[in-house]
């Protein structure tokens, strides 16, 4: 489950690409924000997951990206753009995780770190990674409205993952204070 990235924000991400030799920068089609990863699913589970996700009620919200980060402290393997802290985004991620758990998937063991992966790396030059992080530390995207989340499928190819939207779920519900 993920958020699709609007074109204006994707263009901003494309401007951040470069400066790290050997980095495999994500294409426009690969850009998304994962809310919850579940791995391979059989047909019966797919239907239950679809029903559970369709029942989620959460309001639309504004989102913006600010700053960058890396996964892999000693040996960086990913560069990403960070989402500004957002209670409604966190609320949606918790709702998605709970819905998936109710249909038999294990709860996500990872802390939700709202981000969009920009590049994947193997044995990068650490100086170049640090330079890239410093150069883009204060970068900020335009703000945009998140009014849906999607169920994606992915297929690994020699050019990286190919993502496809399988289903879109509109956000709806109370627009005041957030309750869990």
Where are the regions that the model predicts?
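Histidine-dependent nucleotide/RNA phosphoesterase domain, centered on the 2H-phosphoesterase fold
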Residues: 1-180
């Amino acid at each position: 489950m993920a958020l699709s990235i609007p074109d204006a924000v994707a263009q901003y991400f494309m401007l951040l690409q470069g400066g790290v030799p050997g980095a495999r920068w994500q294409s426009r089609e690969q850009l998304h924000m994962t809310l919850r990863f579940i791995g391979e699913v059989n047909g019966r589970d797919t239907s239950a997951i679809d029903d559970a996700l369709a029942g989620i009620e959460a309001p639309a919200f504004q989102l913006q990206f600010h700053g960058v980060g890396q996964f892999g402290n000693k040996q960086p393997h990913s560069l990403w753009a960070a989402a500004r802290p957002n209670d409604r985004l966190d609320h949606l991620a918790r709702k998605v995780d709970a819905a998936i758990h109710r249909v038999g998937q294990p709860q996500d063991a990872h802390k939700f770190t709202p981000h969009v992966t920009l590049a994947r790396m193997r044995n990068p030059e650490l100086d170049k990674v640090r330079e890239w992080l410093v150069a883009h530390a204060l970068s900020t995207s335009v703000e945009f409205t998140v009014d849906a989340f999607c169920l994606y499928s992915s297929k690994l190819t020699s050019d990286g993952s190919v993502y496809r939207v399988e289903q879109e779920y509109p956000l709806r519900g109370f627009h005041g204070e957030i309750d869990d």
